Amino acid sequence: MHIKNIFIFLALGGLLAACGGGAGRWSVEQNDATTAPAAMYGTYTDSSSHRMAVLLPSSGDAGATGRAIRSSVEMAVLESGAENLNVSFFDSARGVDAINDALNSDPEIIVGPLFANDARTVRELKASGLPVLSFTSDATAVGDGVMTMALMPTNSVESIVREMQSDRVHNFIVLAPDTETGHLLAGAARAAANAYNVPLVGAFFYVEKDSDSIKSATQLATMNVARTAAHTRAREILSDILTNESLTSIERSSIIRQLDKLSKNDVIGDLPYDAVLFLGTGDDTKSLASFLRYFGVGARDAKMYGTAMWDGADIASDLTLSGAKYAALVDTSENFVTKYERVAGAKPNRLASFGYDATNVAIGMMYSDKSNAAYLLDPSGYVGTDGIFRLRPTGDSERALRIMQLTGDGEVKVVKEAATDFMSPLYNIEQRHISPMGELSLQTRGVNPMNYITLPERIRGKYKSKTYGANMTAQTNAQLVDVVTMLPEDDRDPVVTEDYKPVKLAPVVRTYIDSIEVEE
């Protein structure tokens, strides 16, 4: 029965099945899993009354998101058939007043809140033994009984860097948004690079949805100025030789062939990396990939990788990203999607499915004979609507991810299935130990055009060139001098955004840039 903002389920009869245990300790060490993840669904009977508070925004800018999660919470409560269960909803958009109201309702567990700041406030005000299942992905906002159901950014980054190791990537760079989240993700990439021995050799940041900023970041990352200058100088040398030197027919043919080859490209020079990891949204990634190709770095030059930020993005048919891989959650349960659409009139996003699982976990805890900590922190985890997951004593979550690959023809294929249990550890890094990363310039000896053209030995000594290189920090063995070093200048303040949230991204019509003229 629905009364205002409260669901009340009263027992009509039935035997006592189990009573919720005590809080337990949130700091306990989590042992290795010994069994498969448990299913969370069933019918719960108990003669004791149980109370659950739900803290979600129902008004304000995030009201639509909160209402979407609420629909899944209500679904889970109704489907559970739990007896003597009282569920109260509180509008977290009201701030600390709503949090105090939720705490004063004397709940056994709180589902929510959505944002990190609210989670911190709840953590500060709640009793130490009260468990909270939030939806923030900020590791600094959880702990001390506040847990999260969200996908932690480190899970996604570590999964894809591990795939890079499997692909035998030698060195990689990251392209990330110049936001708090972007710098944190870059830090996660650095930690994963160290853990899996895949060197991270460059990090470049851009303003989201800003074409000029994206262009500048990719131009810098591709060493475009140096590689273009080296290309120009190589053509000059070959043209001078063809015009001014007395050549044999074989020598002349060789020079002409090299000039013809150079005419088909705008740059020369090897890159100090063979992979690119995109840490932004799918739409920004498409722009970045187009500029990379424009500046002479395509899929043949560097393998491309992404994170769960691509999940749901309109990116599958992008030819510039053909072959790119990314980490993603498994498809949401079709059964849940069908039921949710029938109830809410719209497809569920990932947060809605997280809310459904959070509610089932909460109900299971209240009706369990285990302590709260023992139930919630079960090392075997649970089977949810988006695959298996488990909660950690630190408050973080772990979710099994699969590896997807873009085929370039609108299709996405699974190249590595998600794990189905936690018998072996899935992750080695924790977000709370990650430090945000700043820009990392490429360490390169630059580009000497003489290394990319072949001259007759008898005249080679007459022609020389300086080495061109952007952000050149490694020592060069060449005897040529006048090395040009070009450093980026950027006095913009970082752009701070809301919490990272693994929600489905709305498709945006792409504008191709193939015809843009780039001024050097």
Language-model regions, residue ranges each:
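Extracytosolic ligand-binding ectodomains
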Residues: 2, 6-12, 19-520
